[in-house]
Amino acid sequence: MEPNKDDNVSLAATAQISAPPVLQDASSLPGFSAIPPVVPPSFPPPMAPIPMMPHPPVARPPTFRPPVSQNGGVKTSDSDSESDDEHIEISEESKQVRERQEKALQDLLVKRRAAAMAVPTNDKAVRDRLRRLGEPITLFGEQEMERRARLTQLLTRYDINGQLDKLVKDHEEDVTPKEEVDDEVLEYPFFTEGPKELREARIEIAKFSVKRAAVRIQRAKRRRDDPDEDMDAETKWALKHAKHMALDCSNFGDDRPLTGCSFSRDGKILATCSLSGVTKLWEMPQVTNTIAVLKDHKERATDVVFSPVDDCLATASADRTAKLWKTDGTLLQTFEGHLDRLARVAFHPSGKYLGTTSYDKTWRLWDINTGAELLLQEGHSRSVYGIAFQQDGALAASCGLDSLARVWDLRTGRSILVFQGHIKPVFSVNFSPNGYHLASGGEDNQCRIWDLRMRKSLYIIPAHANLVSQVKYEPQEGYFLATASYDMKVNIWSGRDFSLVKSLAGHESKVASLDITADSSCIATVSHDRTIKLWTSSGNDDEDEEKETMDIDL
């Protein structure tokens, strides 16, 4: 490629400018002497600038447009379409990997949203938020942190579904100062308006309890002031009587494990129930002949109890009902209303009301004459299992799987005492005849004695090697206390110092229930080994031993 003429001209001009000037000899000039010439230092000649060459033009690649068909679509050859199908097709393994990646990404996004979600830490606020969202406030076995985690998942789900308006509204209600007022309101007890029959029942219970309490106090004062009354001697005699209790008879009660037993008020009939749903009435004292067989429950029977004033009896079942019977097998009433299976049943001392406990976290009070539900009592956070009435009739005690025992005033409907001490579910409670002691037994293998006057635990009995299924005071004066356990034993404890008096062993499986006759002469126990056992004391032998001891002393 030849250079341009303009480029040659510029190179020549540059060369002329860059050449050094020619120095004349100073001696040839007038007025100057001959001076040796000064030789300038040698410098390398400057390099000429490199000429800028223009860039060659860049040729753009030709654009190709696919032919367009008449209907507007792009024409493709069969070979091209087949090659495209080969590149687009994905294997099943790749699809599974992609699905796993998408799921992992979705889970990560959900976790990020959940972590960024504003969720209250106050348990009351969490419950209130769940109530407003229409969700269950508390699930079975749920703790505070689990409840908050469930609320977080619900709010995250609503956020993903795009229900932001509801979330923003709830959040505004939570951050407003009104939340503090709502929390203060929740601290106060809430009341549910009951029917007119409940008010009448409370008045009747109050009148009944005042009379019974007056009689009990007068009797206690008389025994204290009367010199002929020797309470210590009576206590020793009762404990000695209990110490010599032994197995009197045993019989199979059903084809399935037995769950409950109860004596009639005169001690002539023993009722037992079993997992087969059948309740049987046995003739005492040998329990070999059945008087009646009650077969109306559709599920397993969980408890049976006789009325304290007549020959009626009540049964509880897992079919969510309780039934009232006569001793001849006639069904009188069916009590329906519980939302889950029943656990225990108990008569009020007046014989007019029936209390039932259920796994729906409530216990209820029924009118046995009309079959109407008078009271639905909440208060336990988990299933309610045991129930008992004070002999005066003023108080009721309940226990449950929340490890608490609560005492209720039936005259006002208030929870007056909450006994905390068991570390596992409580299955049985029973009032002492003195009116101010309460015994409770539970899964922690302990039997605790509570004092209603001192409002605290009076004594802790390490009763058994397995859970305590039932506790029962001697019905006359509370001289001793009997406990049944899943360790296949029934233990008798002193009602004064709670020392072990006697251990009744003979069952081959879990002891489910026990009962004591009104005169304390016999103890009945039923077990999962399907047997009924009666324990009695040989009083004549004790009297003979005392006579022999007196003769020796003389």
From Swiss-Prot:
Residues 48-99 are annotated as: Disordered. InterPro entries: G-protein_beta_WD-40_rep, PRP4-like, PRP4-like_sf, WD40/YVTN_repeat-like_dom_sf, WD40_repeat_CS, WD40_repeat_dom_sf, WD40_rpt. It is found in: Nucleus speckle. One of its GO terms (biological process) is cell fate determination. It holds the Pfam family WD40. GO terms for cellular component: nuclear speck; spliceosomal complex. Keywords: mRNA processing, mRNA splicing, Nucleus, Repeat, Spliceosome, WD repeat. This is U4/U6 small nuclear ribonucleoprotein PRP4-like protein. The gene is LIS.
